[in-house]
């Protein structure tokens, strides 16, 4: 039951700005439903762009019964770039030691057995590496090969992909 509730919750959140049931309360004010996973057999993955809740590739996490654990930020030293010629649009997170940090990420937890099929879907220049979070924890997460940021727009100042998308959308 817990796994099914978690999948339903993640799917509901991935649909965007929906209300909670028949109320006018936004879904985001409700805490996420967590699946009961064995921490010894699960992997925490930080996502930063098209895999965030409500974004086009979030379904790849939901299909693997991943559970949203929290939204947090990276440690200092990271920069975020809007990569050119990606579909759907994607950011690239790069550690260069100079970034102010504080890039928004979501931490998802998935069973070890689902991790390989998830990683196999990630196209270059993106990949999975170890990220340091603002509180000092380390998790696996999306990183970008440094050559891909040549000519890419540095969007670090926005603090995250969602904020950049919101600012770049015409009103």
Where are the regions that the model predicts?
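Mid-chain, well-packed structural core segment of small domains
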Residues: 93-135
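Short Gly/aromatic-enriched secondary-structure transition segments
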Residues: 57-74
């Amino acid at each position: 039951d817990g796994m099914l509730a978690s999948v339903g919750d993640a799917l509901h959140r991935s649909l965007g700005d929906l209300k909670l049931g028949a109320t006018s309360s936004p879904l985001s004010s409700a805490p996420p439903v967590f699946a009961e996973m064995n921490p010894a057999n699960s992997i925490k993955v930080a996502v930063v762009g098209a895999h965030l809740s409500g974004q086009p590739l979030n379904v790849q996490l939901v299909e693997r019964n991943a559970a949203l654990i929290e939204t947090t930020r990276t440690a200092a030293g990271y920069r975020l770039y809007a990569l050119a010629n990606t579909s759907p649009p994607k950011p690239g997170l790069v550690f260069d030691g100079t970034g102010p940090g504080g890039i928004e990420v979501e931490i998802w937890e998935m069973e070890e057995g689902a991790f390989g099929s998830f990683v196999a879907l990630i196209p270059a220049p993106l990949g999975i590496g170890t990220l340091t979070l603002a509180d000092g924890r380390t998790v696996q997460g999306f990183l970008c090969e440094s050559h891909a940021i040549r000519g890419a727009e540095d969007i670090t100042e926005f603090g995250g992909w969602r904020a950049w998308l919101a600012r770049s959308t015409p009103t």
